Amino acid sequence: MPTVGVFNKEGNKVADMELNENVFAAEINEYALHQVVVALLANKRQGTQSTKTRSEVRGGGIKPWRQKGTGRARQGSIRSPQWIKGGIVFAPKPRDYRVSVPKSMRKVAMKSALTSKVQDNQMIVLDSLNFEAPKTKSMIEMLKALEANKALIITAESNEVVYKSARNIQGISVIPANNINVYDLLKYEKLIITKDAVSKIEEVYA
């Protein structure tokens, strides 16, 4: 079983913790990671883009000049794509970009992402994470002690105090354990996670 150190908010190591090898020491599947990240980004798209084709642009119903005898190139409508204010060729229309990924692949990708953080020594386990009140200064001091500039903080439950303490810090994001996703795990350089959150993740993915 992989073992990691457990730290307090001051950055001091207080204990060691064994991790579930089925979750944090799994085989890294790059194909699954790619498929899930592509799907997550595609599913974020609104798909509301819309421009007009030549049949939808107002005007242009009359031929601008006769077919022959003017010396100019033949034209059928002033709303053809080559004209200023003409329609758009293959105009983008509203569409659904949603991509479905099998649940088993999502699970493999999640284990791969968590394993990569452990292997790269980028996962920091905290014994607890609580502040008396929302204070950005307290969060900055903790991040400095843990040497984390760009980090994803995972808590066991939604914690408004922790969230408010971190929301004004660039490169830091806070999410509860039940909302983690592969994209966020890979996007941030370091993963800061509480012991309770580790247990929750192991319950779901082990």
From Swiss-Prot:
Disulphide-bonded residues: none
Location of region: Disordered: 47-77
Reported function: One of the primary rRNA binding proteins, this protein initially binds near the 5'-end of the 23S rRNA. It is important during the early stages of 50S assembly. It makes multiple contacts with different domains of the 23S rRNA in the assembled 50S subunit and ribosome.
Listed name of the protein: Large ribosomal subunit protein uL4
Gene Ontology CC, one term: ribonucleoprotein complex
Quaternary structure and partners: Part of the 50S ribosomal subunit.
GO-annotated biological processes: translation
Presence of keyword Iron: no
A Gene Ontology molecular function term of the record: rRNA binding
Family according to the record: Belongs to the universal ribosomal protein uL4 family.
Sequence intervals crossing the membrane: none
Alphabetical list of NCBIfam families matching this protein: rplD_bact
Matches recorded under InterPro entries: Ribosomal_uL4, Ribosomal_uL4-like, Ribosomal_uL4_dom_sf
Keywords: Ribonucleoprotein, Ribosomal protein, RNA-binding, rRNA-binding
Keyword Cytoplasm included in the entry's annotation: no
